[in-house]
């Protein structure tokens, strides 16, 4: 007997599971960065709650951090030809307009692109302050390597909108040195302003390392928070009954997580005080051990980095 479902990083599959949960009424906690349309009123099942956020938020945070934290206002944007890329682009455009940035050039490539040389030649010629890209996973590794090989790192700030330990590990340390990105979670929060969050992140990371031998990455942490939220709701409701779990979360929207405070909204998406951490890649001279990949520089969060409820039909 299945009482609840947690998981799935692929957008199409998570939406398909959500549709089944509408029909069969299961609590569902997906663990991906889901398309913006997923959160439009009427899309999610009554007891589907997503612990991640949307690519729109990723793009908004990336542009906001580039402009406000790094002082880089002339942006060249490279998107991806799918909802991931389009949502990130919409977020970048919104933040750029809000904070006085200018998108001086943009391009778009399909997922799986391996040769970025033509695009990067255009980026180099445009001379932006910052090059923000929507690529992820293997695509991001290929892109960031080629940025380094073509010398872009010396001429502008390289900013991959959403990074993980896996992407960073796939790069030579020299290519990782000085690049920026937003991440959902980084295991080493040394020097961060909120000591309670630092403590919770450190304790969680130690448990994870003790069990698996590597530090937790962003998506492992989305899954951890999703599962934790499910169990907290079950304990409050004293039931796995979907309506009882929904009521437990709706009546008690505030929670503390290993990445700081969060609060569930009407769209079943949590607003995090620290939604994304701005990280800077460490090069060979700074890196002290295998997983010493980034330094946390700043943070983006709060209601302002999320799409408005009105825009989602609420």
Enumerate the language-model features and the residues they cover:
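Extracellular/periplasmic periplasmic-binding protein-like sensory domains
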Residues: 147-224, 235-236, 240, 291-313
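Short hydrophobic/charged patches on amphipathic alpha-helices used for structural packing
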Residues: 18, 63-64, 117-121, 141
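Extracytoplasmic ligand/sensor domains, especially the bilobed periplasmic-binding protein
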Residues: 2-106, 157-181
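Structural motif
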Residues: 1, 58-61, 108-122
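Solvent-exposed, acidic/polar segments of extracytosolic/periplasmic ligand-binding ectodomains
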Residues: 177, 250-314
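Hydrophobic alpha-helical
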Residues: 11-22, 128-150, 226-229
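Surface-exposed patches in mature extracellular/periplasmic domains of secreted proteins
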Residues: 7, 77-80, 215-222, 243-245, ...
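Sec-exported extracytoplasmic/periplasmic mature domains
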Residues: 1-2, 18-26, 67-72, 93-101, ...
């Amino acid at each position: 007997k299945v009482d609840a479902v947690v998981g799935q990083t692929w957008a199409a599959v998570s939406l398909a599971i959500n549709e089944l949960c509408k029909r069969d009424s299961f609590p569902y906690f997906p663990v991906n960065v889901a398309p913006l349309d997923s959160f439009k009123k009427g899309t999610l099942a009554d007891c589907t709650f997503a612990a991640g956020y949307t690519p729109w938020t990723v793009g908004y945070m990336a542009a906001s951090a580039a402009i406000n934290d790094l002082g880089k206002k002339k942006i060249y944007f490279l998107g991806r030809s799918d909802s991931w890329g389009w949502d990130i682009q919409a977020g970048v455009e919104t933040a750029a307009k809000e904070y006085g940035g200018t998108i001086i050039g943009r391009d778009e490539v399909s997922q799986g692109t391996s040769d970025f040389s033509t695009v990067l030649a255009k980026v180099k010629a445009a001379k932006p302050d910052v090059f923000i890209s929507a690529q992820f996973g293997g695509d991001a590794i290929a892109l960031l390597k080629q940025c380094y090989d073509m010398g872009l790192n010396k001429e502008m700030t390289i900013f991959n909108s959403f990074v993980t330990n896996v992407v960073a590990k796939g790069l030579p340390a020299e290519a990782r040195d000085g690049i920026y990105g937003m991440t959902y979670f980084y295991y080493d929060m040394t020097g961060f302003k909120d000591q309670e969050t630092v403590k919770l992140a450190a304790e969680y990371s130690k448990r994870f390392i003790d069990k698996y031998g590597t530090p937790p990455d962003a998506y492992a942490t989305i899954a951890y928070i999703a599962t934790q939220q499910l169990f907290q709701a079950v304990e409050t409701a004293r039931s796995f009954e979907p309506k009882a779990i929904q009521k437990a979360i709706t009546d008690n929207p505030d929670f503390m997580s290993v990445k700081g405070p969060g609060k569930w909204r009407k769209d079943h998406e949590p607003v995090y005080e620290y939604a994304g951490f701005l990280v800077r890649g460490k090069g060979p001279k700074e890196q002290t051990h295998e997983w010493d990949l980034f330094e946390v520089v700043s943070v983006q969060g709060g209601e302002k980095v999320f799409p408005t409820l009105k825009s989602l039909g609420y």
